[in-house]
A protein has these predicted regions:
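Alpha-helix N-cap/helix-start motif
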Residues: 29, 48-49, 102-106
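Transmembrane alpha-helices of multi-pass inner-membrane enzymes
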Residues: 87-119
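Long extracytoplasmic/lumenal interhelical loops at the membrane interface
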Residues: 2-43, 64-73, 84
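Short amphipathic alpha-helical segments
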Residues: 13, 31, 35, 57, ...
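Hydrophobic alpha-helix feature that most strongly marks membrane-spanning transmembrane helices
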Residues: 2, 6, 19, 54-67, ...
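Hydrophobic transmembrane alpha-helices and their immediate junctions
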Residues: 43-88, 113-114
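Gly/Ser/Thr-rich beta-alpha loop segments that engage phosphate groups in nucleotides
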Residues: 10-14, 46-49, 93, 98
Length: 119
């Protein structure tokens, strides 16, 4: 991130650049094993800032939805979805610390779910 602080090394290029930045080369490229460092390496500080804003905004929206919705008026399935939305974001944040999942579809489905629930 320090060599390419604004835009990073580019999307899906962490693996290809591992050799250049690794202090210990064992002949294999490795995964970053952190969503946060993966996004930082591939999209720079600008991309990481936007990603954190996206996740934070989604969590706030999900939390407000949970607190401001009269759950008794919802169908059982919708009630479960409204209750699960903030938990899903928290689960992503925690697991994202140990897994590289910033550019795979489940987190974006979670964001879409929160947007759909608001409507």
């Amino acid at each position: 991130a320090l060599d390419n602080p604004i835009f990073g090394v580019g999307m899906n290029n962490f693996y290809n650049n591992y050799f250049y930045y690794s202090t210990h080369w064992d002949g294999l490229n490795h995964a970053v094993h952190s969503t946060w460092f993966g996004v930082l390496a591939e999209s720079g500080f600008l991309g990481l800032s936007l990603f954190i804003c996206l996740i934070t905004t989604t969590f706030i929206a999900a939390w407000k939805l949970l607190k401001n919705t009269d759950l008794s008026k919802l169908s059982p399935g919708m009630r479960v979805a409204v209750n699960a939305a903030p938990a899903g974001i928290v689960g992503f944040v925690v697991s994202g610390t140990f897994l590289t999942q910033g550019f795979i579809w489940p987190v974006y489905l979670q964001i879409a779910l929160v947007i759909a629930l608001q409507r």
